[in-house]
A protein has these predicted regions:
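Short, Lys/Arg-enriched alpha-helical recognition elements, typified by the DNA-recognition helix
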Residues: 143-146, 197
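Short, Lys/Arg-enriched, Trp-marked, Pro/Gly-tolerant hinge/linker segments that flank
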Residues: 126-139, 152-218
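Ligand-binding loop in jelly-roll beta-barrel domains
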Residues: 82-107, 112-113
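Helix-turn-helix DNA-binding motif, specifically the short coil turn and the N-cap/start of the second
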Residues: 221
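Generic protein-terminus/edge-of-domain signal
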Residues: 1-76, 83, 91, 115-116, ...
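Acidic/polar active-site rim loop that often engages polyanionic ligands
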Residues: 100, 121-127
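Short hydrophobic/aromatic patch on the recognition helix
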Residues: 74, 224-229
Length: 229
């Protein structure tokens, strides 16, 4: 198996500059090893694409907006659009996994379709992520699709096959996701604050920074800044 050394480039706001696999299709698919990251820890980052992880062997801790879950062999996770996240191993143990990033624009055929079927998923504040276990039938279908994304990545018609499977997975997710507390809830403001502050740190890491400077970048007090970090 060829493992790609995973290098991650971040923008000032801590969003990832995703290097997609196809010039015209926002699709990124890799098989990786956690040991390829410094200290078995990926950088904390976010992106508009949804992230899909399937663990082939070993296990991985995963931090989503400060919530830590354990993904074991045969399990996976879907991380929703715009969430701060990273994978790591507390014990520096090896983990072999598939990582897939798919941008929802792949499914946005029209404004009505985006409004009715895409936005209700990516704006669902009750679903920052979905841990997938094979014991739950609909989770198992999603896990099969994540493996299929990887298996189809070298096909002559890979973007077509992957987008078709993405639409099928999206349908399952749409039908089974937890209900959002409100149709029009704004994005979690704390996440916006964290993005602003991490962006400030990223931009000014070579300079001397105080807690006050970082808090000011998030337009919050120093005690709230400490609590968020």
């Amino acid at each position: 198996v060829m493992y790609m050394l995973i290098s991650m480039e971040l923008n000032d706001d801590h969003s990832e500059k995703v290097r997609y696999d196809y010039p015209d299709y926002p699709i990124y698919i890799r098989k990786g090893l956690l040991s390829h990251y410094p200290n078995y820890t990926a950088p904390n980052h976010w992106h508009d694409a949804l992230e899909f992880i399937f663990v082939f062997s070993g296990a991985m801790n995963y931090n989503i907006n400060g919530h830590i879950v354990l993904i074991q062999t045969g399990e996976g996770i879907i991380v929703n659009s715009g969430q701060m996240h990273f994978g790591f191993s507390r014990t520096k143990s090896e983990c072999e996994f598939i990582c897939v990033l798919l941008h929802p624009i792949l499914l946005c055929g029209s404004y009505a379709f985006e409004r009715d079927y895409i936005l209700p998923v990516i704006q669902n504040t009750a679903m920052p992520y979905m841990l997938l276990t094979p014991q739950t039938p609909w989770h198992n279908l999603c896990l099969n699709f994540i493996r299929a994304f990887y298996e189809n990545k070298d096909s002559a018609i890979a973007p077509l096959k992957i987008t078709a499977d993405f639409a099928a997975l999206w349908t399952i997710l749409f039908e089974n996701m937890p209900k959002s507390p409100s149709e029009k809830l704004p994005q979690n403001r704390d996440l916006t604050i964290i993005k602003n502050m991490t962006g400030f740190i990223h931009k000014n890491y070579a300079k001397k920074m105080t807690l006050s400077d970082i808090a000011r970048a998030g337009a919050i007090g120093q005690s709230k800044c400490c609590k968020l970090f």
